[in-house]
């Protein structure tokens, strides 16, 4: 198996891979079954878990030089990469065990796994036969998981010099890793949009679906809305939703001299104008914040709210449907978590309805925003 993994790693390094700025996506039409039951969700989940575990195992055969080459970086933080890999393996094992609970209904991709060693063994020999019912999915999935893994490894390699959602700095920070199985939370960044815009459509759509989400607003955008439409209109916009803060401007809060004022001004504005919707959460743009900021957030009673599943809907290289397909693939892989969209992007008008339709019969839950 070691020899096979070595050659797999060599092919990864020598083969053409997408540029770091091109996010991974997976055409879900290559998967031959609709997710019309919890059991079929589990079948697809087991497949994505094993495919990603195989990619993760292959990456561990690369030495530091080869890993730098693969990630396109001159220096990398190996400690953070190792920590990320360990966390990923732990989540994969837990998720595979959860996905195995429906094997009595459909045994596809059900293998004997009683611990980490056996999971790694199954990942090492995981492959799809040429005559398999799932053969059309095999190669697109392999490419997706390699590219997605590289996204995550690259963030870990740069951490903490460039902070991101890949790691937590302390107890004042959270993501969705502790959420229950099959439970997801919707969040939207960088709004509100210009009037009228996607934010208006989105909050109305969510209310019609009897759903709620957390909107992380920018102070300057909220102020523009307030000046144009007034307090009552802004309150009506976010009726039934939760509103956190993302700072006054959409820029990194890790090296900005006025980062504290940015957060304080935005928090004061939201508390004053839409106090009933305010939740004490800060979402750092790009996930970038200072390593020593925990004391500030604690003093302000704020929790740093990160995410697990990035829709990458701001990327010009992804269409709305590709963004939704990326999210669904990662929902199958991680089985729970916080999903991050941007309500300033028109793509969400297509992506969110597509996602809800694709998962409507999968036995998933959408967490109320006040619980996040």
Tell where the protein language model's regions lie, with residue ranges.
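Charged/polar, solvent-exposed surface patches and flexible loops
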Residues: 51, 83, 87, 94, ...
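Short, intrinsically disordered/low-complexity patches at protein termini
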Residues: 267-269, 329-330, 364, 372
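Alpha-helical, coiled-coil/dimerization segments enriched in small aliphatic residues
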Residues: 189-190
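Active-site-adjacent pocket scaffolds in enzyme catalytic domains
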Residues: 20-47, 291, 296-334
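Metal-dependent polysaccharide deacetylase catalytic core of the NodB/CE4 family, i.e.
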Residues: 116, 120-122, 128, 132-136, ...
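Short, composition-biased local secondary-structure segments
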Residues: 160-177, 197, 253-271, 325-327
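Terminal accessory/targeting
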Residues: 2-186, 197, 204-213, 335-372
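Exposed alpha-helical structural elements
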Residues: 144, 232-233, 322, 326
